[in-house]
């Protein structure tokens, strides 16, 4: 079982006791449906054959990065779950470019 704790620094906790921290995201992720988007992204990555740890860490990072991209264009206060989904492609592109 992997446990994901979202906060200023999100933590992905593994069954072996390892913890991976991610600092992407903002307060906009408190919006309704953001956790569902994260779950869907992780499930999609698992469906593509990623290992559980990779899917969890990458999913947390992509959703957090999507929230940051949104806040850079608009305001994190107006972030919606749909906005996160709409920016996932941009987040993935930015991640691949770096």
Residue ranges with predicted function:
Residues 1-98:
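Small-residue (G/A/S/T)-rich helix-start motifs and N-terminal tracts that mark the onset
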């Amino acid at each position: 079982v992997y446990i994901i704790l979202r906060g200023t620094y999100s933590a992905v906790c593994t069954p072996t006791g390892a913890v991976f921290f991610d600092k992407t995201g903002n307060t906009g992720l408190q919006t309704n449906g953001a956790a569902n988007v994260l779950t869907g992204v992780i499930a999609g990555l698992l469906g593509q054959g990623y290992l559980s740890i990779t899917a969890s860490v990458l999913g947390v990072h992509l959703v957090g990065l999507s929230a940051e991209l949104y806040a850079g264009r608009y305001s994190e206060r107006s972030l919606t779950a749909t906005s996160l989904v709409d920016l996932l492609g941009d987040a993935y592109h930015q991640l691949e470019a770096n």
